[in-house]
From Swiss-Prot:
Its main location: cytoplasm. One of its GO terms (biological process) is tRNA modification. InterPro entries: Rossmann-like_a/b/a_fold (IPR014729), TilS/TtcA_N (IPR011063), tRNA_Ile_lys_synt (IPR012094), tRNA_Ile_lys_synt_N (IPR012795). Ligates lysine onto the cytidine present at position 34 of the AUA codon-specific tRNA(Ile) that contains the anticodon CAU, in an ATP-dependent manner. Cytidine is converted to lysidine, thus changing the amino acid specificity of the tRNA from methionine to isoleucine. This is tRNA(Ile)-lysidine synthase. ATP binds at residues 25-30. The gene is tilS. It catalyses: cytidine(34) in tRNA(Ile2) + L-lysine + ATP = lysidine(34) in tRNA(Ile2) + AMP + diphosphate + H(+). Its EC number is 6.3.4.19. It is found in: Cytoplasm.
Amino acid sequence: MKILIKLWTNLINRISNKKYLAAVSGGPDSMAMLNMYKRNIRVVCHVNYHKRESSDRDQQIVVDFCRKNNLIIEILDVDEKVYERYGHIDNFQTKARLIRYDFFKEIGKKYNIENLYIAHNFDDFLETAYMQRARQSKALFYGIKESNVINGIIVKRPVLFVRKQTLQRYCDENKIKYGIDETNELDIYERNRVRKIISSWSLNEVYDFKKFVIKYNKEHSSFANFIDLSYIEFKKNKYKYDYFIRQDDMVQYYLIYYFLIDHKIINPSENKIISLIKFFGKQINKEKAYRVQENIYMHVNDDELISLISYNKSDNISNSNVDIIDDHNVIEK
């Protein structure tokens, strides 16, 4: 395995002329990726949320590696001022994701780099697919894609099909320091619970689940491509209500989903999307808007474009030009 990884990374390093940002936490996955692909990495990005006792230790591990290998490092020290900017988001995982991807975008602009390496591994892939299946998600792709665009950044995952234990062994064999996130063992997050389930699987169970996921993704690939093209057209038309309302319910579902993701409304629930389809399916009423997140509402504006507006209940109603009506999800403008 060690020889195969070395041959693969050497090949990638030779054929790739692009320079990348790299998101590095200090854990074994990202430290292994950093060492494997350091020839292609121009800037290392590290985010310190200060939510764990070991946060500063992990930061120092990344700093020391970058100094030793003459790599530029950019660090986001997430303090209360940063958290306040994302105060409208209750879920910490969602908030943390938005914080780091905004940071990656900022650093990408600073260095004129549009490509980003992230160290998602095969265990992450399995965990994501498992949770999607357990929720009976309408996702058209189970797992994590090798490449996609997030917040305007081209994200590449070069170690996606390498097991976590293999990456940790790579670090040990190459004497690369790393930190272990102590919260990974706590059952406070759904992913941690799923991680324990998958870690108990036999190789045959892993293989069977992988086979199921590959089959699912193949069966949905044509429709997924159609949805991608439909959303590109929807976006090109500045989210015209007329374009949206002419689609069938299933297409509308994904147009709303992608719209919300595009506008940083992370993990919208299926019930929320279905409610929005019903809301927009009624006779167009520009005087109403539907809540998609705390203080954020979706509506059809005066130009008949679907858009978001911000409204805080503590605002002076006369200043905001908004009146509350009975449905707690809906406001009347």
